[in-house]
């Protein structure tokens, strides 16, 4: 069985485009909610910290990718068998103008 798990922040981190889908803000037209089997909320502060750890390891991504990694880790702890696939679709340089890299 394949399951689609949507990772979202538990609260809005202050970066436009990263608002949780459950808050009813702008939902992308390409999002087909019928294919999502589960929504998994990730703590925004933890995601922020994980993205900093990834940057120190040479993977320079944004906060959403920190959330994806945390989500994959959470799912891995729940699974007895299977595979988890995630995509890091963000780059850290988009957030130079924020406090993310201070």
Question: Which stretches of residues belong to each language-model region?
Answer:
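Active-site/ligand-binding loops adjacent to catalytic centers
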Residues: 1-63, 78, 99-102
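Short, active-site-adjacent cap segments at secondary-structure transitions
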Residues: 12-13, 68, 93-94
